[in-house]
């Protein structure tokens, strides 16, 4: 008798072996096994039928359990590594915000939408967070309290993009949609829809204010154009014909002098705002580009090292480095000339959103693999943290809460040339991110 199994368990195993051999017509082996195990004729064919499939089920269960054990061991190792690198209790209160990474559990899960979340945006001053959805609505939340404040209705198709901006003391919320329109909402007047902008000939994919304190709005569309709008008049003041395909995303440099766009043609392009001309094409992705962003000056030192530069660019210069995410499951880092610096591999599905840590050391990405991934630029873009199951479905967007003090950057173009670049080196900021998902929820990590 086995030293591991009890007498009853051993008997069950022996009968299962006989049942399995009988099912594959190994009659000689059955006879031999009956003799060896002293199982007589009282174990009839009818009784044998009860044990058919028992051994196979046990085998499959063992394989599944082994896989589950390996997965759990991997997660334990990852969590242990995270724990080992975490600050001690005594130092946590004095932790440098530049090293902040989101915890595994969200502070708030905001649920009210009836469709997938496509975009989120933070108010630049107040604790308000806007979310857009495939249910055609925009919802305004208090991200500190985790409460719904109001629902905005007006679009007749999926809301695809959101951004807060506008002149000082006159913050507006801009939204864009597959209904071909851009709408402006006034937070100071109960988010009244004060203007609707018409001009695009197809779905509007993305909308951004050119600079935080300005009145120029940038939009990207499936009609292959980028348009600039004066929000004070509602007029389109410039159109850039990309000569490409569906433009999925657009992002301005911090000084409003440059744009980066990306889309279905698998290329990202850096544009000069004043002339509307392309400065560089970033070629290398093998599928649609879903998201693109300029690196903040606080990242220049890390990215310059990755690029092999002897010294980083001045923090007064803009559009020096770009990050893109695509349906080819990769994140790519580029310099302003269009040279590929690094490809970050880790996602196992489409990459849908990117945001740089204000401290400059990290880049966060989200994707259809339901994860938030944190890449350490000081370690050559090493993946240092993965929030598995950040949502229950595809993670479609991510945003970092802006620091109200950084609104002074909007006047950067008016600064004297002699001003030092430390004005862009963020020393204090709010450690808050928000993500949206196809599970119809927004999650806030603090």
Curated annotation (Swiss-Prot):
Gene: PAC1-1
This protein's domain notes: Dimerization mediated by the LisH domain may be required to activate dynein.
Species for this entry: Uncinocarpus reesii (strain UAMH 1704)
Protein origin, superkingdom: Eukaryota
GO biological process, one term: establishment of mitotic spindle orientation
WD repeats mapped onto the chain: 112-153, 155-195, 199-239, 242-281, 284-344, 346-385, 390-430, 432-446
Domain LisH: 9-41
GO annotations of cellular component type: cytoplasm; microtubule; microtubule associated complex; spindle pole
Protein's cellular compartments: Cytoplasm, Cytoskeleton; Cytoplasm, Cytoskeleton, Spindle pole
Family as reported in the entry's similarity comment: Belongs to the WD repeat LIS1/nudF family.
Pfam family, one: WD40
InterPro entries reported in the protein's UniProt record: Dynein_regulator_LIS1, G-protein_beta_WD-40_rep, LIS1_N, PAC1-like_LisH-like_dom, WD40/YVTN_repeat-like_dom_sf, WD40_repeat_CS, WD40_repeat_dom_sf, WD40_rpt
Protein name: Nuclear distribution protein PAC1-1
GO molecular function terms attached to this record: dynein complex binding
Coiled coil: 60-86
């Amino acid at each position: 008798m086995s030293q591991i199994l009890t007498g009853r368990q051993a008997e069950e195993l022996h009968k299962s072996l006989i049942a399995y051999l009988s099912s594959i017509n190994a009659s000689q082996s059955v006879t031999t096994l009956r003799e060896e195990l002293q199982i007589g004729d009282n174990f009839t064919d009818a009784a044998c039928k009860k044990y058919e499939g028992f051994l196979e089920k046990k085998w499959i269960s063992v394989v599944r359990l082994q896989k589950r054990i390996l997965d759990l061991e991997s997660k334990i190792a990852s969590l242990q590594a995270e724990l080992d690198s975490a600050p001690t209790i005594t130092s946590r209160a004095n932790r440098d915000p530049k090293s902040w990474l989101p915890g595994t559990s969200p502070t708030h899960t905001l649920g009210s939408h009836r469709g997938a979340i496509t975009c989120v945006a933070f108010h630049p001053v107040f604790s308000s967070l806007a979310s857009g959805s495939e249910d055609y609505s925009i919802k305004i939340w208090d991200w500190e309290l985790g409460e719904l404040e109001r629902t905005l209705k007006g679009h007749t198709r999926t809301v695809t993009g959101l951004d807060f901006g506008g002149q000082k003391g006159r913050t507006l919320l801009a939204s864009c949609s597959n209904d071909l329109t851009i709408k402006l909402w006034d937070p100071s007047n109960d988010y009244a829809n004060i203007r609707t902008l018409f001009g695009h000939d197809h779905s509007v994919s993305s909308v951004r204010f050119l600079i935080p304190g300005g009145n120029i709005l940038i939009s990207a569309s499936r009609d292959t154009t980028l348009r600039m709008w004066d929000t004070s008049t509602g007029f389109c003041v410039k159109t850039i014909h990309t000569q490409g395909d569906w433009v999925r995303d657009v992002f301005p440099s911090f000084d409003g002098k440059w744009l980066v766009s990306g889309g279905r043609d698998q290329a990202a392009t850096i544009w000069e705002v004043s002339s509307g001309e392309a400065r560089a094409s970033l070629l290398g992705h093998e599928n649609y580009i879903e998201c693109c962003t300029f690196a903040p000056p606080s990242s220049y030192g890390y990215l310059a090292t990755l690029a092999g530069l002897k010294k980083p660019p001045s923090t007064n210069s803009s559009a020096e480095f770009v990050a893109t995410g695509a349906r080819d499951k990769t994140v790519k880092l580029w310099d302003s000339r269009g040279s590929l610096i690094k490809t970050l591999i880790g996602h196992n599905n489409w990459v849908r959103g990117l945001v740089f840590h204000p401290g400059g050391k990290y880049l966060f990405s989200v994707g259809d693999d339901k994860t938030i991934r944190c890449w350490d630029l000081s370690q050559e873009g090493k993946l240092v943290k993965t929030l598995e199951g950040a949502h229950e479905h595809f993670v479609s967007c991510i945003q970092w809460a802006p620091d109200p003090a950084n609104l002074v950057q909007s006047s950067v173009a008016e600064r004297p040339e002699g001003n030092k670049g430390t004005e862009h080196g963020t020393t204090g900021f709010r450690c808050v991110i928000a993500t949206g998902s196809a599970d119809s929820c927004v999650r806030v990590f603090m």
